[in-house]
């Protein structure tokens, strides 16, 4: 089984483009990542055959439009889910199997198994109207995994749960999705969920694909600033890109930093001598007590501290703008800043696209 999307375009009734030349390919689990209104839901609706679009959607090599709706074997979960309020949880779960003509003796073990996986076994005989909203949403999700459809489309399935229940809901969906033998497309705003559930991803921004590939590549080798920032904890400043003796360097915070990339790694050597965006993560910035450094550099003090994941994040006001640094303790003295060269990304000032060859 394989899903291919080729140069898919979709316009809103107003004429505004919802999706522009979107392409992806997978035979397993793929994440579609992007902020609200990035085009995730529109893409899933196109794959499901619910929108008119230009381009191609191929299901196991066959064009979507050539496959009768009842033969596409696509199941999908959108936020506007529904359950039968006056039917039991068991009946709600069993419904898709029952309409396919399966016998009770075949249905019951499947329902029992999914109910156990999703924490619904003890409420199987309850009518849905007795359930909490979180439980109703869980029923709708669990129902999706009762049969092993070839193509499963999940639109931010954990997003509608309460804060308390969302983590557990994601864990259950992840476990069920990874057990499936078919294709799973998992759309989410949550970069952490995407990292956990899929090895490959498509990053959408305002209907355009900004990067495809592994989540690891997106983290360490982002194609655009918006991709880098989606993971959080990202600094960016402008500096002049220089070259000397076959090496690239920038001057940050009063220190010359030789980069891991060379001029040959640039998309164009025209960038040398010009302002570029220099990006790096909070964790890639180190502070060195001004009394210990021998390498020069400008001196700073933290202006304020935040706490995040058990660590302090210190704010530093510099000549290049505000910088944030992860630190284990609140440091009160003067220091210089050092940025790890291997973690530096370079971007074009206007397009905010990467300057280096992937």
Describe each PLM feature range:
Residues 55-63:
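Conserved ABC transporter NBD signature motif
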């Amino acid at each position: 089984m394989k899903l291919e999307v080729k140069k898919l375009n979709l316009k809103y009734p107003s004429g505004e483009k919802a999706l522009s030349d979107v392409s992806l390919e997978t035979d397993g689990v793929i994440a579609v990542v992007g902020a609200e209104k990035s085009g995730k839901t529109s893409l899933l609706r196109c794959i499901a055959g619910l929108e008119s679009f230009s381009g191609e959607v191929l299901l196991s090599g066959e064009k979507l439009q050539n496959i009768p709706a009842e033969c596409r074997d696509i199941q999908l979960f959108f936020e506007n889910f529904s359950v039968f309020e006056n039917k039991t949880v068991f009946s709600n779960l069993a419904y898709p199997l029952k309409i396919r003509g399966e016998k009770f003796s075949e249905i019951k073990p499947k329902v029992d198994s999914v109910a156990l996986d999703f924490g619904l076994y003890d409420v199987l005989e309850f009518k849905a109207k007795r359930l909490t909203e979180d439980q109703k949403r869980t029923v709708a999700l669990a129902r999706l995994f009762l049969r092993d459809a070839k193509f499963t489309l999940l639109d931010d399935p954990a997003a509608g749960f309460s804060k308390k229940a969302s983590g557990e809901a994601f864990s259950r969906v992840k476990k069920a999705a990874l057990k499936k033998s078919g294709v799973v497309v998992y759309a989410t705003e949550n970069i952490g969920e995407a990292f956990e559930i899929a090895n490959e991803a498509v990053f959408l921004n305002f209907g355009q694909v900004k990067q495809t590939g592994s989540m690891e590549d997106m983290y360490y080798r982002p194609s655009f600033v918006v991709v880098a920032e989606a993971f959080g904890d990202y600094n960016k400043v402008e500096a002049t890109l220089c070259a000397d003796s076959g090496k690239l360097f920038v001057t940050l915070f009063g220190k010359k930093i030789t980069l891991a990339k060379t001029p040959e790694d640039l998309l164009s050597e025209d960038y040398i001598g010009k302002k570029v965006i220099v990006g790096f993560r909070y964790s890639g910035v180190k502070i060195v007590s001004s009394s210990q450094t021998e390498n020069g550099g400008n001196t700073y003090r933290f202006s304020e501290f935040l706490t995040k994941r058990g660590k302090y994040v210190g704010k530093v006001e510099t000549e290049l703008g505000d910088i944030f640094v992860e630190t284990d303790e609140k440091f009160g003295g003067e220091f210089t800043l050092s940025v790890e060269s291997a973690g530096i990304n370079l971007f074009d000032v206007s397009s905010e696209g990467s300057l280096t060859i992937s």
